[in-house]
């Protein structure tokens, strides 16, 4: 097979990875292995970094932390050599989330901040917003509310400057939910209510089921704390109906607990 034919095959593998990631772990890993073999044979560092990253991401989704870290560690060096900065930032984000899940807050903080530095240095705005939301959540979960609010507000500011409507709504929704939760944890229910109103006014028309689930969990807690049990029960009923649609509730497990 000539060079052009080989490139076509590799591009097809890469597209298969991008199409199947998060949907079909076995197929994604098979394609990554094909790419890895080809990249090693042809000494293609960029391609090998791509394969290791998406293998690591897939193992993360499978909750296989050992294989995730092994692949991501191999990916980072190669991604740095070949200037794939967004994948590096995403790598640090994945390692941070996994560290949080393992209870290693200090390691998670280091990974988040390193990822944030790459985002700021290379202008990776979308990933920067995600990491700021995650950092804010880490501070919030540990009771450092002022720092949490600072990151949520920075993320909100970035979202406001993003012209893409869909991405803008996703970021805004996350910012509003996180700020509402942060104020609610501090007992500042008037400010919580203000952000719930912003969610309804600015984001509701874009909601998908998973978004409604996040917001309903927030509202149910708020109505419980304000002793509005009729509205609380209505939100809980809506949550039950959405869960019965087989929404992936692990994505919002903390909110449901």
Which residues does each predicted region cover?
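Flexible inter-repeat linkers and adjacent short helices
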Residues: 1-88
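Amphipathic coiled-coil alpha-helices
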Residues: 12-13, 31, 52, 71, ...
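Solenoidal tandem-repeat scaffolds enriched in leucines and small polar residues
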Residues: 105-108, 115-191, 208-209
